[in-house]
Amino acid sequence: MIKPRTPPGIMELLPREQIAFQRMLDVIRRNYERFGFLPVETPVFELSDVLLTKSGGETERQVYFVQSTGALANAAAAADAGGENGGLPELALRFDLTVPLARYVAEHEHELSFPFRRYQMQRVYRGERAQRGRFREFYQCDIDVIGKDALSIRYDAEVLAVIHAVFAELGIGDFKVQLNNRKLLRGFFHAQGVVDAEQQALVLREVDKLDKRSAEDVRATLMGPDFGLAEDAVRRILDFAKIRSVSHADALDKIDWVVNEVQSRSGGNEDLHAGADDLREVLELVKALGVPESAYCLNFSIARGLDYYTGTVYETTLTDHPQIGSICSGGRYESLASHYTKSKLPGVGISIGLTRLFWQLREAGLIQGIAESSVQAMVALMDETRLDDALDIARRLRIGGINTEVQMEPKKVGKQFQYAARAGIRFVVLAGDDELARGVVAVKDLVREQQFDVARDELASTLQVELEQARAMLVAGGVQGD
């Protein structure tokens, strides 16, 4: 007999946790749609040459390839015969949603309306080294706005407003969207003598590690043989990376201070001024969108490690749980699909890694206030002769919007109560001879441990009221129900 087990790096949930996870998905989807984003799904596997066109190194080593048993047999036979095995398998599982989006937009470019606003919430796969909190299969929940030839900076502000709406409704605690601009970073580094674009990208990666490594470690790296930066330049870079704003007005002041500081030393440069102008406009529009200033700040150490970001960058953290790290990140890029089309397709987007976020919230005890079951009521079967009545009551409840289960075989009432309690079902509906003769049913509320009679025709509306009251009480307790 084979021992039942799952591979490492998989998060498999019991029903109660799956309900909580699903409700988080629903909150994210609902807010994406409120802002006018359209759903897209792409295949779980793509053609290998399409998926890997711009990857390499670590990414390619983490890709899962897909091969049929027939193809495997043919490859093995070819190898046994001393021939070539044909190279990489034809298909590979997606490792993120960005590359499939690039392929999708390039392939359907002439069928889409631009700016194209898309959301995508699907599993992705990476061959991560097995360790606690790292997953090989995980959900990503992405939005992107894609332009044709150009895309207004105003969308960068709207994306931040989406982040705020999502996490405000999730109710998992105070959070902060941290904001920066890669152009401003490049301009600042240029003023410190880091002129080469490739070296700037490497310095950006080091600055982006400041939340994981000490400033002294980063200082030593930047002054070491790989970078060889002067001590004064490194000091100014690290001082710059410490800058945080505490209010909307302070953020604008900090931008002006950085620009003036660089101008006084080197006269400024185009990237610095362009990045500063973009940040100012984003901040003013974020305010106009109604995002409270307590929910966002400037953080000049935010760089995002991916090189394709060219402007605004975001990282979101939980204020009371900084150890969780970034719970949502993204930014602006200038050419989404340059490997698939000659068209220029700039965009801005963010991604929520929901599987890792859910796991961390569960570990921190922040997944609260969730019903144990998606079933809201159970109709008990008192005896065989009342099956038709039980089915009719269940039908009426479902029409009234109540998720309802029916006991299909008569059992002792105590056993039916026990089953409902273990399954996390709140209401048990009893329809015996006495109740039916009076035109009512009895309802047992297993949460309040109360029993009451309700007219048969008013059962669904009565339970709806009870459930709405329960939802209202849970709003402050964690992720909200539907």
UniProtKB/Swiss-Prot annotation:
Gene3D superfamilies: Anticodon-binding domain (3.40.50.800), Bira Bifunctional Protein, Domain 2 (3.30.930.10). It is found in: Cytoplasm. It comes from the Bacteria. GO terms for biological process: histidyl-tRNA aminoacylation. Pfam families: HGTP_anticodon, tRNA-synt_His. GO terms for molecular function: ATP binding; histidine-tRNA ligase activity. InterPro entries: aa-tRNA-synth_II, aa-tRNA-synth_II/BPL/LPL, Anticodon-bd, Anticodon-bd_dom_sf, His-tRNA-ligase, HisRS-like_core, HisRS/HisZ, HisRS_anticodon. Its main location: cytoplasm. Disulfide bonds: none annotated. It catalyses: tRNA(His) + L-histidine + ATP = L-histidyl-tRNA(His) + AMP + diphosphate + H(+). Belongs to the class-II aminoacyl-tRNA synthetase family. Homodimer. NCBIfam families: hisS. This is Histidine--tRNA ligase. It comes from Xanthomonas euvesicatoria pv. vesicatoria (strain 85-10). The gene is hisS.
